[in-house]
């Protein structure tokens, strides 16, 4: 079945405040391997703590992350759908994505060869910075990923690719996208299209696997 017409929620910039974090007076690096995780460089009014306990290494807990300035565009009720730790991820991902990597590049017509170019060269492109999410089990990486896509979606960037290790995990991706108030069928499997055929979607999240990307065109 085709995805129903999207009835998108209205996007609003997520309100938060940055804070100067200092370790508690008299605190010292503990002998423990892990410390309980808490937001250090920002506060998100109205956001709930994560429903399960999160931890981080004691060394990481002793240093606050840099203060962000990026404000994601998200539904007004997002605080009821994502925890403060998950919203923090969406903020820092956006902080990375608004910037570019150094240098300019030429990409060939097949999109598989890249070479350095002068920044003022005709047809030169720049690449956006990436963001690596290294959270472990229980942090809700699916919902965090969906939140990052939703931020872009509500800014008008309505095409995304979701790559996973198994095609069976599309149900998880659809669940996480739907949990943010979006139409689950907007997450469309690449397997719906013949290999090598043009993908005609005007908007949506194309779900595929690493194995599919490695396979040859059968056309």
Regions found by a protein language model. Name each.
Residues 1-6:
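Acidic, low-complexity intrinsically disordered tails
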Residues 11, 16, 21-29, 48-82, ...:
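SF2 helicase/translocase NTPase motor core
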